[in-house]
């Protein structure tokens, strides 16, 4: 893939004395692994650009799973994330690295990612709404289609005052028992609209995305989530 395309660095680590190994999310090629030769050398003009949350244009090529970065240009300065929004951005980056297959195109998700990072950079309050919207978008692009507005058992429209239990691969069914896998009809409407007007709907959205993402993450915990827990007291 030798043409220019938009991209963000998800993660980087030293590779040999002068190079970097990059995990990069691109608009056209999805997630790719690139070697940036000489990027760590003192004369390299790439070091400052190859940072997370910096909008890039990149060219790369080669055979095999690991490609070679040919060129990279920063489109703008890095989006300003700090404190809780920085940890949130690192979480989003790790989530993409963990669940997306290599070199599978997710052009629409790329823009969902961009909008999420922009929302985090401009957040004046909690980053949670932006995170929940991105998680729901990610699940949708992975083929995790859930009908939030209809009962899987009867097909009836959900009622705001009723409780529904989530069943993986089936959807939501009416339930009289309330536990971690149950949601009110009001919660389900918020999930469908990706709008969370209060803490109650935000907490419900977080519960749902944790349940839905678990099969993709396996048993290995997210490092960024642990950092986030240390930075933000449990609510």
UniProtKB/Swiss-Prot annotation:
<comment type="similarity">
    <text>Belongs to the RecO family.</text>
</comment>
<comment type="function">
    <text>Involved in DNA repair and RecF pathway recombination.</text>
</comment>
<dbReference type="GO" id="GO:0043590">
    <property type="term" value="C:bacterial nucleoid"/>
</dbReference>
<dbReference type="InterPro" id="IPR003717">
    <property type="entry name" value="RecO"/>
</dbReference>
<keyword id="KW-0227">DNA damage</keyword>
<keyword id="KW-0234">DNA repair</keyword>
<dbReference type="InterPro" id="IPR042242">
    <property type="entry name" value="RecO_C"/>
</dbReference>
<dbReference type="InterPro" id="IPR022572">
    <property type="entry name" value="DNA_rep/recomb_RecO_N"/>
</dbReference>
<dbReference type="InterPro" id="IPR012340">
    <property type="entry name" value="NA-bd_OB-fold"/>
</dbReference>
<keyword id="KW-0233">DNA recombination</keyword>
<dbReference type="Pfam" id="PF11967">
    <property type="entry name" value="RecO_N"/>
</dbReference>
<dbReference type="GO" id="GO:0006310">
    <property type="term" value="P:DNA recombination"/>
</dbReference>
<dbReference type="InterPro" id="IPR037278">
    <property type="entry name" value="ARFGAP/RecO"/>
</dbReference>
<dbReference type="GO" id="GO:0006302">
    <property type="term" value="P:double-strand break repair"/>
</dbReference>
<protein>
    <recommendedName>
        <fullName>DNA repair protein RecO</fullName>
    </recommendedName>
</protein>
<dbReference type="Pfam" id="PF02565">
    <property type="entry name" value="RecO_C"/>
</dbReference>
């Amino acid at each position: 893939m030798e043409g220019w395309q938009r991209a963000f660095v998800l993660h980087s680590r030293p590779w040999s004395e002068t190079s970097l190994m990059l995990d990069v999310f691109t608009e056209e090629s999805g997630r790719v692994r690139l070697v940036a030769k000489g990027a760590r050398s003192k004369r390299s003009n790439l070091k400052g650009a190859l940072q997370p949350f910096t909008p890039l244009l990149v060219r790369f090529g080669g055979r095999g799973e690991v490609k070679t970065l040919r060129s990279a240009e920063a489109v703008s300065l890095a989006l300003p994330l700090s404190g809780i929004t920085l940890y949130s951005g690192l979480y989003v980056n790790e989530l993409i690295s963990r669940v997306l297959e290599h070199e599978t195109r997710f052009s629409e998700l790329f823009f969902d990612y961009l909008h999420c990072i922009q929302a985090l950079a401009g957040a004046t309050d909690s980053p949670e709404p932006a995170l929940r919207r991105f998680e729901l978008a990610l699940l949708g692009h992975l083929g995790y289609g859930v009908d939030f507005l209809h009962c899987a058992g009867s097909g009836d429209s959900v009622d705001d005052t009723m409780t529904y239990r989530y069943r993986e691969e089936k959807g939501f069914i009416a339930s009289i028992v309330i536990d971690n896998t149950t949601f009110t009809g009001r919660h389900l409407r918020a999930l469908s609209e990706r709008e969370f007007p209060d803490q109650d709907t935000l907490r419900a959205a977080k519960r749902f995305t944790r349940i839905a993402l678990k099969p993709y993450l396996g048993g290995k915990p997210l490092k960024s989530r642990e950092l986030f827990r240390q930075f933000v007291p449990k609510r």
